């Protein structure tokens, strides 16, 4: 199963139509609530996980072959959900994903109550949770919506942590791109090499060591 999170202004149906038909996986693309879906944080994160649980209960799916991806806001959601629930996904594959709100917007939530409430949303504080996972990062080098610096920073941060890390930066590509328009599937979300990794990777059921941060 591939859980795919849409970007702002996109719904699940549009997201699903960006994928080619696959004989080895279901593509589950939920539509989040409200125009920006809480950036797949808080209630948005709950929506994603509840959709996953429904799919697992409805279809005959191997829970060791569940993967997570998304584009733009959904790429951020992939980072956030991935570092928060690393035990659920074999491959974590953000495309054009921003890291977190402070880095993306320049906001500073400080260390008071507001900052403590936002602590679980700081992706970089939890990246070590991805150590045993397969991570596949996709970004266009000419993306003027989510700068490629986000992907490059995550690659640099994860290189000493994640053994199975792939970084694909498409030269000259913008925010949404397809290098092979005559072939089914949109490459920025349905890149063949990434799909081959998902098809082959199985989630290791061994217990994980992971990091949590208390808001107190």
Over which residues does each language-model region extend?
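Conserved alpha/beta-hydrolase "acid-adjacent" motif
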Residues: 145-150
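Alpha/beta-hydrolase-fold serine-hydrolase catalytic core, especially in secreted/extracellular enzymes
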Residues: 156, 160-216
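Mobile cap/lid helix-loop segments that gate and shape the active-site cleft of serine hydrolases
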Residues: 7, 14, 87-133
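Short beta-strand/loop motif that positions the catalytic acidic residue
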Residues: 130, 136-139, 143
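Short beta-strand immediately N-terminal to the catalytic nucleophile in serine-hydrolase-like folds
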Residues: 4, 68-70, 95, 138
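Active-site machinery of serine-nucleophile hydrolases
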Residues: 1-58
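Gly/Ala-rich beta-loop-alpha elbow adjacent to hydrolase catalytic centers
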Residues: 69-78, 143
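Gly/Ser-rich "nucleophile elbow"/oxyanion-hole loop immediately N-terminal to the catalytic nucleophile
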Residues: 37-73, 83-89, 129
């Amino acid at each position: 199963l591939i859980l795919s999170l849409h970007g702002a202004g996109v719904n699940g149906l549009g997201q699903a139509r960006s994928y080619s038909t696959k004989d080895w996986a279901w593509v589950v693309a939920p539509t989040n609530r409200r125009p920006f879906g809480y950036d797949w944080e808080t209630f948005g994160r709950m929506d994603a996980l509840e959709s996953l649980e429904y799919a697992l209960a409805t279809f005959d799916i191997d829970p060791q072959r569940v993967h997570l991806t998304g584009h733009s806001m959904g790429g951020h959601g992939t980072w956030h959900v991935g570092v928060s629930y690393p035990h659920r996904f074999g491959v974590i594959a953000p495309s054009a994903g921003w890291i977190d709100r402070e880095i993306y917007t320049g906001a500073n939530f400080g260390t008071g109550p507001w900052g403590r409430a936002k602590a679980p949303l700081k992706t970089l504080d939890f990246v070590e949770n991805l150590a045993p996972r397969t991570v596949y990062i996709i970004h266009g080098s000419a993306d003027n919506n989510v700068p490629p610096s986000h992907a490059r920073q995550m690659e640099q941060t994860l290189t000493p942590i994640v053994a199975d890390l792939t970084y694909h930066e498409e030269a000259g590509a913008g925010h949404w791109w397809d290098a092979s328009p005559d072939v089914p599937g949109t490459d920025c979300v349905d890149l063949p090499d990434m799909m081959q990794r998902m098809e082959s990777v199985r989630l290791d059921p061994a217990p994980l060591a992971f990091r949590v941060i208390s808001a107190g």
